[in-house]
């Protein structure tokens, strides 16, 4: 409940209550309120439930109407009540501020009739002295002019601006629109947009005083919207909605808190009473509030009503009539003209009886609404036409004879055709008055077509680059790997010559002159140069990746070993070498090693034959911005260079040489082992002794054909084995055969012993059983 009963601050005779200050003192007692108070007013049509809303929301006790007895004026003049209790969804423990609530006499009441002077002044007073003005309206009133008090608000805005608009402070008033009986069919956002548009339109039409010509509605007011359910039919939801509304009056620090500092008048409470009385005196004496005349108001209301009815009928017929014709220009334009003329004719028949200036003003507004509605269909038709024409263009470009028609020619012809047909359709709408201005549509169309052509050009370029890349990359890789796997001292000269020739061969079809290319898709010289540069970047990156991926430590060691063995194992004619002495091996070793190491430095650093480091003529990566990025450290703590020419670090070079030395040393040792048998000299007297002692056997062998044959076979076998140094494999075979024979013999002996042991055990078991039987 309120702290005190409400008092009539301004009575129905427009007199300000002189005991207001005493009332405030009674409400606050001995407390020093200072600036910690707030003023709220409610404004709206008579019998719309304003007092009821205040009583439920702020626990006040304003008089309310008993609808079961009679609908009549309850609040007369302006009443004031004090409260600290706001109905909220949660309990607030902190000290609540003092709130003073003004219940303003309802507008459009039958008791005052056409005398609207008091309701205008009361509304203006409420705006002038309040922080928050609650505008109470029913959902069905939105869109009306009188029913939702828009005409009154316009007058109040105008006079408020003339009286208080020149103040230099930043004071504002919050207009809180409380939409009653909101059932939710129409979203609150849609309703708020409608009211906001009406308010903004009213503000632009105001007669502003000097110095305020450029002012905006939002320089003086903030707008908020809240929907409340039906109090009788949805009582629980209504109560919950009111509590949610109450949260915004007490929840400080939240985004939806209504009592913002810029709304407060920054006056002590006793100063506010003086300020309020002075405002009422100024409003009461101002004669400009007696505007406009009832005739003009009626004309505006009725013409707006007729306009809305005509527009609603137009919209109701529109979709059904237009939908089947959207693809046919002739039928569509005829139907649009027919619907528009029917709508304007209906408006003219009824609205032309009112004041001509108001009638023409509303007719122009109706015509604008019709054109706005029709423009959506026109835009939809033109967009559909654009899509169709664009599909035709893409088909023409893709199916063109590439041998006779270039991409540029095909696109240019298609673009000209599209523009011609599009402009013809747009002119048809314009001539019939269905399209007021075509500048925006033309600009949008031009931008759209340019963007689509750019996309088509990009796709064509991407396809060309893809074809170039498909051939260029594998060719470069194959050629480079082949040259590096069989390197010479001039391998980098060969690689760079092959690199340039491969690029040139793949893009020769687009070359117009030296270092100038035209990729034949309608690009400028600089754009073509950029594409050429990108191709070179692709080629350089491929070369860089191929070289550094291939020339790893193991690969370089393998290349050096192959070069060593080519000279060490084979002579100049390519025949295998047969070693006789160690000196011969050592000499060949030195020559082969020198031959292998000739290319070691070449494979470590990419330089030309004249000792110039190979440096790419294009940036290799986006992050290349200076020398700071040329050196990096790997996971093992080794520093590397990002520069293309630097292949091996000093540490890696030492690693390569160590592995290479170990491998070639093993090769040399194997070769020396092969001639060990030739170093063993048999004494000559052994041959004489063999001849003397074995003469008889020799004669016996010669005389026996079998022995001769075996001797020849064994001799040939011995010669082949000795000639090709196969004693090692023969020894291995013999050892393997002997081992297998030994294993077989052991298995047989083991089997024999086991079987013999089993037989003995069998006999012993029989003898043991016989002895047992005898003992028994």
UniProtKB/Swiss-Prot annotation:
EC number(s) recorded for this UniProt protein: 3.6.5.-
Lineage of the species this protein comes from: Eukaryota, Fungi, Dikarya, Ascomycota, Saccharomycotina
SUPFAM superfamilies per UniProt: P-loop containing nucleoside triphosphate hydrolases (SSF52540)
Chief site of localization: endoplasmic reticulum
Record's function text: Cooperates with the reticulon proteins RTN1 and RTN2 and the tubule-shaping DP1 family protein YOP1 to generate and maintain the structure of the tubular endoplasmic reticulum network. Has GTPase activity, which is required for its function in ER organization.
Protein source organism: Saccharomyces cerevisiae (strain AWRI1631)
Protein location: Endoplasmic reticulum membrane
Name of this chain's protein: Protein SEY1
Top EC class of this enzyme: hydrolase
Gene3D superfamilies found in the cross-reference section: P-loop containing nucleotide triphosphate hydrolases
Subunit structure: Interacts with RTN1 and YOP1; GTP binding is not required for these interactions.
TM spans (from-to): 682-702, 706-726
Record's bilayer topology term: Multi-pass membrane protein
């Amino acid at each position: 409940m309120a702290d005190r009963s409400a008092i009539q601050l301004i009575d129905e005779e427009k007199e300000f209550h002189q005991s207001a200050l005493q009332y405030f003192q009674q409400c606050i007692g001995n407390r020093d309120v200072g600036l910690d108070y707030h003023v709220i007013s409610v404004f709206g049509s008579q019998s719309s439930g304003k007092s009821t809303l205040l009583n439920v929301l702020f626990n006040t006790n304003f008089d309310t109407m008993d609808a079961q007895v009679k609908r009549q004026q309850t609040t007369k003049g302006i009443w004031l009540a004090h409260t600290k209790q706001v109905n909220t969804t949660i309990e607030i423990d902190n000290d609540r501020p003092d709130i003073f609530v003004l219940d303003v006499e309802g507008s459009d009441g039958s008791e005052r009739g056409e005398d609207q002077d008091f309701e205008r002044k009361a509304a203006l007073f409420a705006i002038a002295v309040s922080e928050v003005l609650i505008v109470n309206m029913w959902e069905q009133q939105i869109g009306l002019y009188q029913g939702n008090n828009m005409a009154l608000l316009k007058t109040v805005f105008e006079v408020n601006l003339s009286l208080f608009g020149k103040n230099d402070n930043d004071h504002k008033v919050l207009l809180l629109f409380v939409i009653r009986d909101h059932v939710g069919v129409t979203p609150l956002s849609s309703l708020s947009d409608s009211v906001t548009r009406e308010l903004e339109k009213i503000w632009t039409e105001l007669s502003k005083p000097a110095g305020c010509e450029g002012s905006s509605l939002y320089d003086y007011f903030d707008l908020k919207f809240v929907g409340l359910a039906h109090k009788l039919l949805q009582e629980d939801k209504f109560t919950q909605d009111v509590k949610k509304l109450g949260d915004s009056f007490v929840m400080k620090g939240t985004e939806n808190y209504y009592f913002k500092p810029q709304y407060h008048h920054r006056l002590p409470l006793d100063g506010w009473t003086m300020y309020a009385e002075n405002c009422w005196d100024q409003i009461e004496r101002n004669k400009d509030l007696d505007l406009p005349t009832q005739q003009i108001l009626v004309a505006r209301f009725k013409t707006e009503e007729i306009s809305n009815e005509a527009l609603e009928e137009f919209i109701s017929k529109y979709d059904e009539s237009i939908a089947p014709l959207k693809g046919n220009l002739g039928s569509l334009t005829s139907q649009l003209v027919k619907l528009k003329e029917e709508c304007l004719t209906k408006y003219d028949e009824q609205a032309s009886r009112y004041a001509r200036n108001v009638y023409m003003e509303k007719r122009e507004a109706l015509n604008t609404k019709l054109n706005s509605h029709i423009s959506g269909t026109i835009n939809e038709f033109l967009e559909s036409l654009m899509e169709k024409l664009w599909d035709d263009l893409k088909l023409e470009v893709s199916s063109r004879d590439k041998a006779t028609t270039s991409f540029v020619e095909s696109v240019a012809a298609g673009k000209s055709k599209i523009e011609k047909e599009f402009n013809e359709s747009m002119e048809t709408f314009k001539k019939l008055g269905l399209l007021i201005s075509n500048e925006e549509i033309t600009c949008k169309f031009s931008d759209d077509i340019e963007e689509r052509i750019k996309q088509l050009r990009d796709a064509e370029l991407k396809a060309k680059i893809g074809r170039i890349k498909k051939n260029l990359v594998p060719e470069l890789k194959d050629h480079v790997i082949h040259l590096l796997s069989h390197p010479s001292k001039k391998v980098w000269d060969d690689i760079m010559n092959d690199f340039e020739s491969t690029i040139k061969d793949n893009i020769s079809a687009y070359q117009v002159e030296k270092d100038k290319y035209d990729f034949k898709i309608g690009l400028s010289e600089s754009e073509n140069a950029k594409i050429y540069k990108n191709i070179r970047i692709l080629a350089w990156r491929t070369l860089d990746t191929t070289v550094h991926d291939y020339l790893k430590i193991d690969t370089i060691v393998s290349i050096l070993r192959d070069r060593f063995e080519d000279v060490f194992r084979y002579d100049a004619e390519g025949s295998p070498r047969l070693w006789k002495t160690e000196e011969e091996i050592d000499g060949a070793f030195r020559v082969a090693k020198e031959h292998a190491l000739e290319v070691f430095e070449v494979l470590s650093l990419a330089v030309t034959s004249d000792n110039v480091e190979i440096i790419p003529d294009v940036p290799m990566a986006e992050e290349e911005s200076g020398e700071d990025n040329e050196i990096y450290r790997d996971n093992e703590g080794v520093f590397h260079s990002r520069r293309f020419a630097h292949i091996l670090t000093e540490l890696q070079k030492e690693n390569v040489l160590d592995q290479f030395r170990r491998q070639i040393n093993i090769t040399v040792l194997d070769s020396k082992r092969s001639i060990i048998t030739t170093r063993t000299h048999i004494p000559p007297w052994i041959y004489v002794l063999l001849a003397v002692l074995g003469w008889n056997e020799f004669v016996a062998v010669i005389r026996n054909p079998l022995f001769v044959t075996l001797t020849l076979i064994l001799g040939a076998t011995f010669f082949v084995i000795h000639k090709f140094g196969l004693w090692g494999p023969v020894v291995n075979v013999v050892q393997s055969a002997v081992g297998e024979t030994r294993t077989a013999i052991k298995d047989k002996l083991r089997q024999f012993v086991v079987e013999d042991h089993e037989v003995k055990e069998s006999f012993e078991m029989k003898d043991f059983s016989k002895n047992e039987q005898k003992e028994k």
